[in-house]
């Protein structure tokens, strides 16, 4: 089973414009579709094992690419909760199998719906002549910028976002849509913040406190934005809401750290270890634009309760 799950996940994650989290959900939906289990408990145990295999594969991928692991963990956690909810309410497993499959694929194929909803919600952020700073590469953020650019003349400044330099991917996509954009060094954020009207960020995960886990450097950018009195907006699907309450970087899981080789010229520091993501506290976030609506950071805890107990 392990090889099959790994193969399905690898295939799904390689599809264009499919995030890691939704690739994981599609993999779980495919497991449900082909499962030979005859009991609800058997199916749920099979899904739990498949999730473990997906997380192991996602961890391997995250070490060599910008693919995210925490979003996979959050998304599959929510997916299994809702599938288990359907299974536990059924009197007969065979009669609910079809409903479980429909629910699974509905969750797995919801990425574009969620992204479109957020882009439409976020459109009100923008105005003519606005300059926006972004960090990393987020399909949700770039989709919102592309939609806004159809109505407003905006400019985008993208940080390089090392170590994977995702900022260049952001600029490449935006330039294809004729959205003016330029990449800057991560260390140059303070130099450019004065000409920025707002910071718009994606997220790998949104924790119970309303804090945001995102590419390393996000916390620094939010601190600089506060110093310059610039708003910080986060665009992310509720699939990324996660039942975690980290208080600092030291509370982040070990999988958040990776080893890299320094660039030529840094031989004395050839082996480097760094976090892939950091935690931005809720007091530095102005608003979150989600597929559940526009939320304040303080509202996240209540929405997590609704998502898991509603």
Language-model segment annotations:
Residues 80-133, 150-199:
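Ligand-binding beta-strand-loop-alpha-helix segment within the catalytic cores
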Residues 69, 112-115, 218:
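Generic alpha-helix initiation/capping and coil-helix boundary signal
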Residues 1-100:
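Long amphipathic alpha-helical segments
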Residues 3-4, 143, 148-154, 159-310:
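Conserved phosphate- and dinucleotide-binding cores of soluble alpha/beta proteins
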Residues 68, 131-142, 163:
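Gly/Ser/Thr-rich loops at beta-strand to alpha-helix junctions
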